[in-house]
């Protein structure tokens, strides 16, 4: 993973975070009731459920750009950067691939002072430090109420990544005004356009109006008289340590309702979220130096950055007297095209002089402001989970870095209070005045509600929820997306061990291990993380002896999960009375369920499969010689169909995870998009259940990703009336693949044990004369770049002295399939990997299905 920034990767057909609008009922789009009315299965599921929570009403609508529109939007930028030769595949979530350009131009000044030449940082943007927080459109994890400054739009950016996440600006385009989250944005009336309505949303009550006009400017003639550049009203690029350049405007201290700026400092208001920051004048440059500081990676990735660019250039356009033609209904991207060309061309004809403020013009954007103190910034940090990582492209073009950091916006909030609390905790524990188990290891709060699974210490409610959601989220390079200790962090150090996927944030190292530890770690190469080192204790960071068991317990014994009645237990059937099994498989994929049943020797009387992918159907039909009966799209299956095909003894399925996975920036949640397909499984499951008085054994199983929102997980559990178990395929295969499984299969929560035939190491899966460079690989997804491993994106295999990717037959063995299982209908390598990336791990399903041998006839 080399480049100026690195973006979150998808974990399972989903990708990168952008602007998610589902807000647990607090903010939804304003589309019509008819449009947002749930499908009959959803209505049935909701009506069947006695409790209808606000989460069920979250809505989000989105639109997508065509490839042609995306290409036209980015062509001029590629020309200026001189790149575009190498493109990464970007999955828009609908099965189409979009080619996005990579940036080889080095983003200026993206390194922090603390970095050594051997260390490359990966920045993600979205927020800044301290003042630079965006309000999260989703309120979860028991955080404090949402109070945020609502001013001129801005969000702190990330610098450019050469390896793009699966979802980019192309796949997550600017939504229609009715559905875009503008909770922190109000467009000045003077710069509004008829084509794109960027006015404030309806969630801006109780805000003050801040207007600074020419009179206030004249009255501040003595402000900023320190022989430094930039006065009130100047349009600038600002730089905060750890983040890339972001557009802003110099304002008077009176506009901030704070104190006067210190000598050599300037108050600036960031475009995008309207926050104010006091920043050194030496870290400001004129907006006229546009090409040197414009960040193509962030523009392609972040809606907030495009919004900031729009308002910045609209302000510049007004000052320069520049006009652009537009047509009604024109998208934001279309309006930005000529604006960006104008900016990259030097703001001709007026040039930089035309951008200077006119004393007759307002010098602060006429935007509504909601005041809040730092305590109310807490929920804001979660908005941009699309955390971008930045690296230095020029170095990347020469050779892979020996060591990299990744920097993200998730920890960009003001963590001052948390760090002070953790410092006190560390001091007390060091002086034997406190117990780690009595404090939250992530934030330092007292009276934790749960234990930390890896290290001695606890977790408070909000940190535990965050841990549940994000611990199994991985980036494109295979590393965890967030810190192993706190599941956030702004700057993350990556373990150098090839088989390790852990990363640790600078904050945790400095507070828990010791001051200066992070700087020392940056200079070490290789650097082994605290999960790999043989020594367990480092400062107050003490690895648990039984961390592997604790980790399993953490995801299966959630104290906040609703207690359900234990599933009905069926006594084992005597061998003489067992009969072949009858199966209904929804979202069947490549017939993993049928394959496992046959491997276990269970006789299958009928296997009815619902699948819409033609390639998957081809695999199942050819490899199982027509023994599988394929039926309609799951949405078209009726109760009458179930009665005709049934009865069934086993119902299995795993609905698409695109709109549930946290790694998807455009995810729509459980109640929209593909997320609502869960309810198709739910209502068909109810149709297949035995009638009252029928005591025949009946089993079912539902699967989905671990990296989903806690509320979605709870809703699924509530409808299915049971809690899930979490199983990671790493225990029985050569690849990570953590999944939740709901169901009533006997012994679902028993320990996972590998069989003698399971291929536990990569070398066991390779063809002759090929050598594995590591024992295990990270989660293999539908993306081709998920094959490369580690922070340097290394090829996992060596053959004849040359590095190589995994072959399709080797991928099949990793998943537990027979070699050439997907080799049908002339499918290419990419298509075969996509089928495998969406499939189940055969050893895991074998582990779950094995108890069925006590109930059904075997061969």
Swiss-Prot record:
<keyword id="KW-0479">Metal-binding</keyword>
<dbReference type="GO" id="GO:0005654">
    <property type="term" value="C:nucleoplasm"/>
</dbReference>
<feature type="compositionally biased region" description="Acidic residues">
    <location>
        <begin position="85"/>
        <end position="94"/>
    </location>
</feature>
<feature type="compositionally biased region" description="Basic and acidic residues">
    <location>
        <begin position="370"/>
        <end position="381"/>
    </location>
</feature>
<feature type="cross-link" description="Glycyl lysine isopeptide (Lys-Gly) (interchain with G-Cter in SUMO2)">
    <location>
        <position position="623"/>
    </location>
</feature>
<feature type="domain" description="ADD">
    <location>
        <begin position="428"/>
        <end position="560"/>
    </location>
</feature>
<keyword id="KW-0010">Activator</keyword>
<dbReference type="InterPro" id="IPR025766">
    <property type="entry name" value="ADD"/>
</dbReference>
<feature type="region of interest" description="Interaction with the PRC2/EED-EZH2 complex">
    <location>
        <begin position="440"/>
        <end position="532"/>
    </location>
</feature>
<keyword id="KW-0832">Ubl conjugation</keyword>
<keyword id="KW-0678">Repressor</keyword>
<feature type="binding site">
    <location>
        <begin position="633"/>
        <end position="635"/>
    </location>
    <ligand>
        <name>S-adenosyl-L-methionine</name>
    </ligand>
</feature>
<dbReference type="GO" id="GO:0141068">
    <property type="term" value="P:autosome genomic imprinting"/>
</dbReference>
<dbReference type="GO" id="GO:0008168">
    <property type="term" value="F:methyltransferase activity"/>
</dbReference>
<feature type="compositionally biased region" description="Polar residues">
    <location>
        <begin position="189"/>
        <end position="198"/>
    </location>
</feature>
<keyword id="KW-0862">Zinc</keyword>
<dbReference type="InterPro" id="IPR040552">
    <property type="entry name" value="DNMT3_ADD_GATA1-like"/>
</dbReference>
<dbReference type="GO" id="GO:0032259">
    <property type="term" value="P:methylation"/>
</dbReference>
<comment type="function">
    <text>Required for genome-wide de novo methylation and is essential for the establishment of DNA methylation patterns during development. DNA methylation is coordinated with methylation of histones. May preferentially methylates nucleosomal DNA within the nucleosome core region. May function as transcriptional co-repressor by associating with CBX4 and independently of DNA methylation. Seems to be involved in gene silencing.</text>
</comment>
<keyword id="KW-0164">Citrullination</keyword>
<keyword id="KW-0949">S-adenosyl-L-methionine</keyword>
<dbReference type="GO" id="GO:0051718">
    <property type="term" value="F:DNA (cytosine-5-)-methyltransferase activity, acting on CpG substrates"/>
</dbReference>
<feature type="modified residue" description="Phosphothreonine">
    <location>
        <position position="112"/>
    </location>
</feature>
<feature type="cross-link" description="Glycyl lysine isopeptide (Lys-Gly) (interchain with G-Cter in SUMO2)">
    <location>
        <position position="102"/>
    </location>
</feature>
<keyword id="KW-0539">Nucleus</keyword>
<dbReference type="InterPro" id="IPR000313">
    <property type="entry name" value="PWWP_dom"/>
</dbReference>
<feature type="region of interest" description="Disordered">
    <location>
        <begin position="25"/>
        <end position="226"/>
    </location>
</feature>
<dbReference type="GO" id="GO:0003886">
    <property type="term" value="F:DNA (cytosine-5-)-methyltransferase activity"/>
</dbReference>
<dbReference type="GO" id="GO:0045814">
    <property type="term" value="P:negative regulation of gene expression, epigenetic"/>
</dbReference>
<feature type="active site">
    <location>
        <position position="657"/>
    </location>
</feature>
<dbReference type="GO" id="GO:0006346">
    <property type="term" value="P:DNA methylation-dependent constitutive heterochromatin formation"/>
</dbReference>
<keyword id="KW-0808">Transferase</keyword>
<dbReference type="GO" id="GO:0003677">
    <property type="term" value="F:DNA binding"/>
</dbReference>
<dbReference type="GO" id="GO:0031507">
    <property type="term" value="P:heterochromatin formation"/>
</dbReference>
<dbReference type="InterPro" id="IPR049554">
    <property type="entry name" value="DNMT3_ADD_PHD"/>
</dbReference>
<dbReference type="GO" id="GO:0071230">
    <property type="term" value="P:cellular response to amino acid stimulus"/>
</dbReference>
<feature type="binding site">
    <location>
        <position position="611"/>
    </location>
    <ligand>
        <name>S-adenosyl-L-methionine</name>
    </ligand>
</feature>
<feature type="compositionally biased region" description="Low complexity">
    <location>
        <begin position="167"/>
        <end position="179"/>
    </location>
</feature>
<dbReference type="GO" id="GO:0031503">
    <property type="term" value="P:protein-containing complex localization"/>
</dbReference>
<dbReference type="GO" id="GO:0141005">
    <property type="term" value="P:transposable element silencing by heterochromatin formation"/>
</dbReference>
<feature type="modified residue" description="Citrulline">
    <location>
        <position position="415"/>
    </location>
</feature>
<dbReference type="GO" id="GO:0051719">
    <property type="term" value="F:DNA (cytosine-5-)-methyltransferase activity, acting on CpN substrates"/>
</dbReference>
């Amino acid at each position: 993973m080399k480049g100026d920034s690195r973006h979150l990767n998808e974990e399972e057909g989903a990708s990168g975070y952008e602007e998610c609008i589902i807000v647990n009922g607090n903010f939804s789009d304003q589309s019509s009731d008819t449009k947002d009315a749930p499908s009959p299965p959803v209505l049935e599921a909701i009506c069947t459920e006695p409790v209808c929570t606000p989460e069920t009403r979250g809505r989000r609508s989105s639109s997508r750009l065509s490839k042609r529109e995306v290409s036209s939007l980015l062509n001029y930028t590629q020309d200026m950067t001189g790149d575009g030769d190498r493109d990464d595949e970007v999955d828009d979530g609908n099965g189409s691939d979009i080619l996005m350009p990579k940036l080889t131009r080095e983003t200026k000044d993206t390194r922090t002072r603390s970095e050594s030449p051997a260390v490359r940082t990966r920045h993600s943007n979205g927020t800044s430090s301290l003042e630079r927080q965006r309000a999260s459109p989703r309120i979860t994890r028991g955080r404090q109420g949402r109070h945020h400054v609502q001013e001129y739009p801005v969000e702190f950016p990330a610098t450019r990544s050469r390896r793009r996440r699966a979802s980019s600006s192309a796949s997550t385009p600017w939504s229609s005004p009715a559905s875009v989250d503008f909770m922190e944005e109000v467009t000045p009336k003077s710069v509004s356009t008829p084509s794109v309505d960027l006015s404030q949303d309806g969630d801006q009550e109780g805000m003050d109006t801040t207007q600074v006009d020419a009179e206030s400017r004249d009255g501040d003639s003595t402000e900023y008289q320190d022989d430094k550049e930039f006065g009130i009203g100047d349009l600038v690029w600002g730089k905060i340590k750890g983040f890339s350049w972001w557009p802003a405007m110099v304002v008077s201290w009176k506009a901030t309702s704070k104190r006067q700026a210190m000598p050599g400092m300037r108050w600036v208001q960031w475009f995008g979220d309207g926050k104010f920051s006091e920043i050194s004048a030496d870290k400001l440059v004129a907006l006229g130096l546009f090409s040197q500081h414009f960040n193509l990676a962030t523009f392609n990735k972040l809606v907030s950055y495009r919004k900031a660019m729009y308002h910045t250039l609209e302000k510049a356009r007004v000052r320069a007297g520049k006009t652009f033609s537009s047509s009604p209904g024109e998208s934001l991207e279309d309006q930005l095209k000529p604006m960006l060309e104008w900016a990259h061309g030097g703001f001709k004809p007026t040039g930089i002089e035309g951008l200077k403020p006119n004393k007759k013009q307002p010098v602060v954007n006429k935007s509504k402001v909601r005041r809040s103190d730092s305590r109310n910034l807490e929920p804001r940090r979660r908005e941009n989970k699309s955390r971008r990582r930045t690296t230095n492209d020029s170095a990347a073009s020469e050779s892979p870095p020996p060591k990299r950091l990744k920097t993200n916006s998730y920890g960009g909030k003001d963590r001052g209070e948390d760090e002070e609390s953790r410092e006190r905790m560390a001091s007390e524990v060091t002086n034997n005045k406190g117990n780690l188990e009595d404090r939250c290891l992530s934030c330092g709060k007292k009276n934790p509600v749960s234990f930390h699974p890896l290290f001695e210490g606890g977790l408070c409610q909000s940190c535990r929820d965050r841990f549940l959601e994000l611990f199994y989220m991985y980036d494109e390079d295979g590393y965890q997306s967030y810190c192993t200790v706190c599941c956030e962090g702004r700057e993350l150090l990556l373990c150098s061990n090839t088989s390790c996927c852990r990363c640790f944030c600078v904050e945790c190292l400095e507070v828990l291990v010791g001051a200066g530890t992070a700087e020392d770690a940056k200079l070490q190469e290789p650097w082994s993380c605290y999960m790999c080192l043989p020594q367990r204790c480092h400062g107050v960071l003490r690895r648990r002896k039984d961390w592997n068991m604790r980790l399993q317990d953490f995801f299966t014994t959630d104290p906040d999960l609703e207690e359900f009645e234990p599933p009905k237990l069926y006594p084992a059937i005597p061998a003489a009375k067992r009969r072949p099994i009858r199966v209904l498989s929804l979202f069947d994929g490549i017939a993993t369920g049928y394959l496992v049943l046959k491997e276990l020797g269970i006789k299958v009387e009928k296997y009815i499969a619902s699948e819409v992918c033609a390639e998957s159907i081809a695999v199942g039909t050819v490899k199982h010689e027509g023994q599988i009966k394929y039926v309609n799209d799951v949405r078209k299956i009726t109760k009458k169909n179930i009665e005709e095909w049934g009865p069934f003894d086993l119902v299995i399925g795993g609905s698409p995870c695109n709109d549930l996975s946290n790694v998807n920036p455009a995810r729509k949640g459980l109640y929209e998009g593909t997320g609502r397909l869960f309810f198709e499984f739910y209502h068909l499951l109810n149709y297949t259940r035995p009638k009252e008085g029928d005591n025949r054994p009946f089993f079912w199983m539902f699967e989905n990703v671990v990296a989903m929102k806690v509320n979605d997980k709870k809703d699924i559990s509530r409808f299915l009336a049971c809690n899930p178990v979490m199983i990671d395929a790493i225990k029985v295969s050569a690849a990570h693949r953590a999944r939740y499984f709901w169901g009533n299969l006997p012994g679902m929560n028993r320990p996972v044990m590998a069989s003698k035939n399971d291929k536990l190491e990569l070398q066991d899966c390779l063809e002759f004369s090929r050598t594995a460079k590591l024992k295990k690989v990270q989660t293999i997804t539908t993306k081709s770049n998920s094959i490369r491993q580690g922070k340097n994106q290394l090829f996992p295999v060596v053959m004849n002295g040359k590095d190589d990717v995994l072959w399709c037959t080797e991928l099949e063995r990793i998943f537990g399939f027979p070699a050439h299982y997907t080799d049908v209908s002339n499918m290419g390598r990419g298509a075969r990997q996509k089928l495998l990336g969406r499939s189940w791990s055969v050893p895991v399903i074998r582990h779950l299905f094995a108890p069925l041998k006590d109930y059904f006839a075997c061969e």
